[in-house]
Design a protein with these regions (language model features):
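Bacterial Sec-dependent N-terminal signal peptides
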Residues: 1-26
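Loop/turn elements at helix/coil->beta-strand transitions in domains of secreted/extracellular proteins
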Residues: 26-31, 61-66, 92, 145-150, ...
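Beta-strand elements within well-structured catalytic alpha/beta cores of enzymes
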Residues: 27-39, 58, 84, 140, ...
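Second-shell loop/turn segments in exported
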Residues: 39-45, 68-71, 121-128, 245-252, ...
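Short, structured active-site-proximal loop/turn typified by the sulfatase FGly-forming signature C/S-X-P-X-R
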Residues: 43-92, 149-153
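Secreted, luminal/periplasmic, and some membrane-associated catalytic domains
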Residues: 67, 76, 98-123, 133, ...
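His/Asp/Glu-rich, glycine-adjacent segments
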Residues: 89, 97-276, 285-292, 413-415, ...
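Substrate-binding rim/cap in mid-to-C-terminal beta-strand-loop elements of soluble/periplasmic
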Residues: 359-398, 467-509, 523-527
Length: 527
């Protein structure tokens, strides 16, 4: 009997020891790189132009999901980054876009505005106050009792702050007016190593000498069809009158600036230097220059990917040299949208037209006055959304549900409108895959009372924001790539959800997932 018990104990000990040996260690560092407007099809299309250290290394050594998808529509930088690091949609995390209408003041606010905190090296007052749930960085700080090193570095303010979350030790972005790395007093005292970088190596000392031209011979750039015949291109950033820093942030050199500050961070902080896991959230840019179309800048977008390939290679080498890629879990993904191309030339006879949201609001108000009497029933409008005057409706003791239904039925009769969804229909109505995506974009406290879905090919003219957008619902492929820390190399084309990133990383760091991240972690990623 004793021998049997002893044998069982030895067997249990051996099995436990083997499991401990085969369980991958917690990564010393996690690096998340979100590349604005990165496209899987462009990565593949321009592959003949790449070296061996960037995309090709990712394809050889990484686990590559070629079709990663967001569970909501109207994606932009803010909503995408918030979704990645919270593991949920705008319906829960509160970040419905870069900007939205504030119901109380009827003014447009930006996703990271907060007058309660002062900017550092910037006049912009910033915090993540609009982010309503926890992020991956928040959960790491809680799990390590604040001992983890968590920093966020990005060309743009919203990408830096929303990736940093509420509890990071710092979020840094390039100032649109000075080129200095900026921050917010929300994150406490501004690090001395960033101040030193600004004083000694700041972009403002070098930008006048930077010129963006083709990295390769111009005959190499033949992978984007365009009517515009480009012989070459040349962009400099020396003219003070042309918002040079904003344009710089849409060039590939912005990615190199991120790498420079990452190098300083790894040199002057404790990131990756002890057994407490740390987190760096980074952002790059991969859209077209000055947010113009590929038709205008076909050569630039190809050169952008060539230089992006170099920047990724430099970053991988930097992490490998300073921390060790085997000690690092590195993931790369995209914001999943692209800047909208202009209206198609009329000669091709593609159906379309113009939908004016201001006219829509005015006509709707006239219609409601004809039924319910005088009054300003439409309070305002913004980004294909109508905001009704709830106080007036309450004062008149009218039925809100009836007004919402009448309004939706009226708007859907307008030219160019495919559907009109009331807030009640989105919250309480029947489920369809399309309604689910729209609902995930919607937030009851921020969004309008009626969401208008405009036909593809039509231009939405928003007089309030002075922006005209062509509606295009075509699929845009976005990648999700893992590399380092025992990652199993494989290329997969099965669609995966971006919402799985936060729970997957949390699983491998052995911490809680963010508090609204309900998706299960991806499996089979590590050896």
């Amino acid at each position: 009997m004793k021998e049997r018990i002893l044998t069982s104990l030895i067997a249990a000990f051996v099995i436990t020891s083997l499991q401990a040996q085969t369980t991958p260690a917690v990564p010393r560092l996690v690096v998340g790189l979100t590349i604005d407007q990165l496209r899987s099809d462009y990565i593949e299309a321009f592959s003949a132009l790449y070296g061996e250290r960037g995309f090709k290394r990712l394809m050889r050594e990484g686990r590559v999901y070629c079709n990663a998808e967001y569970d909501f529509i109207n994606i932009d930088r803010s909503s995408a980054v918030a979704s990645i690091y919270t593991g949920t949609t705008p319906y829960y995390n509160g970040i419905v876009g870069n900007r939205w209408m504030d119901r109380a003041s009827l003014r447009i606010i930006k996703s990271v505005d907060d007058p309660a905190y002062m900017g550092v090296y910037t006049s912009e007052s910033t915090s993540p106050q609009h982010l309503l749930v926890s992020t991956l960085s928040d959960e790491l700080m809680v799990a390590t009792c604040g001992n983890a090193e968590v920093y966020s570095i990005a060309p743009t303010r919203e990408m830096a702050v929303l990736a940093a979350g509420h509890a990071a030790k710092g979020a840094f972005w390039l100032n649109d007016e000075t080129g200095k790395w900026s921050g917010s007093t929300y994150y406490g005292s501004f690090p001395e190593w960033v101040t030193t970088y600004n004083d000694r190596d700041g972009l403002d000392f070098r930008i006048g000498n930077l010129v963006w031209g083709p990295y390769l011979p111009v005959t190499s750039y033949k992978y984007v069809t365009s009517d515009a015949k480009q012989l070459t291109f040349k962009h400099d950033f020396s003219d003070e009158r042309t918002e040079k820093y904003k344009k710089f942030k849409t060039s590939p050199y912005a990615n190199d600036e991120v790498n420079k500050l990452v190098d300083a961070c790894l040199t002057y902080t404790n990131v990756g230097k002890d057994n407490v896991p740390d987190l760096l959230t980074l952002s790059y840019y991969a859209g077209n220059y000055a947010h113009m179309s590929n038709a205008e800048y076909a050569m630039e977008i190809q050169d952008m990917y060539v230089r992006l390939d170099n920047s990724i290679g430099d970053l991988l080498d930097l992490i490998d040299r300073k921390v060790g890629l085997n000690n690092t879990l590195f993931f790369i993904t995209s914001t999943g949208y692209t800047d909208v191309d202009p209206k198609d030339p009329e000669q091709y006879k593609i159906p379309g037209g113009e939908f004016h949201i201001k006219r829509c609001g005015a006509l709707l108000n006239m219609y409601l006055m004809a039924i319910y009497g005088p009054g300003q029933y439409v309070e305002t409008y913004y980004d294909r959304q109508i905001y009704l005057n709830h106080k007036l409706i309450e004062d008149k003791k009218l039925n809100l549900t009836e007004i919402l239904n009448r309004s939706s039925d009226f708007i859907v009769q307008m030219s160019g409108v495919r559907s009109a969804y009331s807030s009640q229909r989105l919250l309480l109505g029947a489920w369809t895959p399309r309604i689910d995506k729209i609902r995930n974009t919607f937030n009851p406290h921020l969004s309008g009372d009626i969401y208008i879905e405009v036909m593809p090919g039509w231009s939405v003219v928003d007089e309030y924001s002075q922006v005209t957008k062509v509606v295009r619902d075509n699929y845009s492929s976005a990648p999700l790539i893992f590399i380092g820390n025992n990652i199993k190399p494989e290329i997969l084309y099965t669609p995966v959800k971006m919402a799985t990133i936060a729970s997957t990383i949390a699983h491998f760091m052995r911490i809680r997932a963010p508090n609204a991240a309900t998706a299960a972690p991806l499996t089979g990623i590590r050896k």
